């Protein structure tokens, strides 16, 4: 079943001596490591290299003298305090830690509240820990440096929002190119619309990195909105070959005409292959030229809301304003089934058709999720209206579902006791049509992000029998 905000938290991926490593935290279980020689192939079974709750955001580091280390932050919800970073020795193969767990930095004592997400590097004899602080939406990027991996560390803020529209520019990674350039990859949290990925130029002054561009004589950088692309050692003529160097953007649509779902889809829980079948015809029959996905009804968890349905097939929002249309056949709908679309965040809504006692019912749902620690409490309102079957044009019982997101304004809010201006407000509208032309506004609401993720939208079919 879904456990929103739990499970696997922020991982790191590293490459060392021919092996790829992914180190990830499960805040209630411990720190895990998995490895592979081929990132597109099979990964090893995860090994818990530090058991116990509390540590998060781990990052492994291999020194040039053969030693290895693990740096990590902590979660107050699991350990009782936050804003502290630790370093511990790690086995060179990454499969265990040993020795004393050393607290290298306490942000509570240095005006670096909520420092977390550490990444360790080495340059010119200095050990650097890149770590965001100040909160996801309001923070900045801090750098620690020391001649010893266990400290003591000095620190410096190297990236702030400044006059840019990029709030909370932090939590990312230093990337260097084959031509010797340095760049910083990070995100920006824009509430319901999720997190935007940014790439900032980076340079060094007195063995401190400066990220973005210096303005007004400041000793820190600000994010850029336009900048040249990184020099990856290719000529303009080489880069013009779109077969080798395609210009890409994340997929959003899917015709379901391949064996596997496209990568933009995310299930609401660990999925089972029996939940769906691609390449089917409108009646759900397998077809070589099929362009439908058949969603099999999955039992709804008793007494849990639609936001906890396991088989919600979702996508992240592709933009702060967009429209998504879904054509759906209800040919196979059985008594107790409910099929439709959903908009999922802390506030959520669903629209679809249910079958009850042989009748087709238009069902709309609006709800709110609240959390006390990790326990979810939901206030959900359900509205139903019987549908005249004459609205269906044929035996496929086809409906059209439209999901529209519009930015309606901005508001002021508080994050970590700080006032934040110009917070975007988006309205999500879910509509239904029986002819693909005339839509009725069935349900709308002000979108609100989920737990550390933006709003997702998608489709589902469940049953309660």
Task: Describe the function of each predicted region.
Residues 1-465:
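Carbohydrate-active catalytic/glycan-binding domains of CAZyme proteins
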């Amino acid at each position: 079943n879904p456990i929103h905000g739990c499970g696997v938290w922020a991982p790191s991926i590293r490459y060392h001596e021919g092996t790829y490593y992914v180190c990830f935290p499960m805040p209630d279980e411990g720190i895990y490591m998995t490895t592979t020689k081929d990132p597109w192939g099979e990964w090893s079974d995860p090994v818990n290299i530090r058991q116990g709750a509390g540590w998060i955001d781990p990052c492994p580091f291999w020194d040039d003298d053969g030693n290895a280390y693990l740096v990590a932050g902590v979660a107050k919800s699991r350990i009782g305090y936050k804003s502290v970073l630790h370093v511990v020795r790690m086995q060179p193969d990454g499969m265990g830690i040993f020795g004393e767990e050393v607290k290298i930095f306490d942000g509570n004592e240095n005006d670096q509240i909520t420092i977390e997400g550490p990444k360790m590097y080495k340059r010119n004899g200095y050990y650097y820990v890149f770590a965001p602080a100040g909160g996801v939406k309001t923070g900045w990027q801090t750098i620690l440096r020391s001649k010893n991996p266990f400290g003591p560390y000095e620190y410096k803020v190297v990236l702030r929002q400044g006059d840019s529209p990029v709030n909370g520019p932090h939590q990312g990674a230093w990337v260097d190119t084959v031509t010797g350039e340095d760049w910083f990859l990070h995100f920006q949290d824009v509430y319901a619309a999720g997190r935007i990925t940014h790439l900032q130029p980076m340079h060094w002054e007195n063995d401190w990195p400066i990220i973005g561009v210096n303005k007004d004589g400041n000793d820190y950088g600000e994010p850029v909105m336009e900048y040249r692309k990184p020099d990856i050692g290719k000529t303009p003529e080489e880069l013009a070959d779109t077969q080798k160097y395609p210009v890409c953007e994340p997929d959003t649509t899917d015709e379901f005409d391949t064996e596997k779902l496209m990568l933009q889809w995310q299930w609401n829980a660990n999925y089972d292959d029996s939940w769906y079948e691609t390449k089917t015809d409108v009646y759900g029959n397998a077809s070589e030229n099929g362009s439908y996905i058949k969603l099999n009804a999955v039992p709804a968890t008793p007494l849990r809301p639609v936001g906890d349905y396991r088989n919600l097939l979702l996508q992240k929002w592709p933009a702060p304003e967009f429209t998504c249309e879904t054509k759906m056949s209800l040919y196979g709908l059985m008594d107790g089934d409910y099929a439709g679309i959903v908009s999922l965040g802390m506030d959520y809504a669903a629209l679809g058709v249910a079958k009850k006692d042989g009748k087709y019912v238009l069902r709309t749902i609006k709800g709110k999720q609240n959390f006390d620690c990790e326990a979810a409490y939901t206030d959900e309102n359900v509205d139903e209206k019987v549908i005249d079957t004459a609205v269906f044009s044929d035996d496929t019982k086809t409906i059209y579902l439209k999901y529209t997101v519009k930015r309606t304004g901005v508001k002021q809010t508080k994050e970590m006791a700080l006032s934040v201006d110009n917070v975007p407000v988006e309205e999500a509208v879910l509509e239904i049509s029986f002819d693909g032309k005339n839509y009725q506004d069935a349900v709308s609401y002000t979108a609100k992000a989920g737990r550390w993720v933006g709003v997702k939208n998608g489709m589902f079919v469940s049953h309660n029998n």
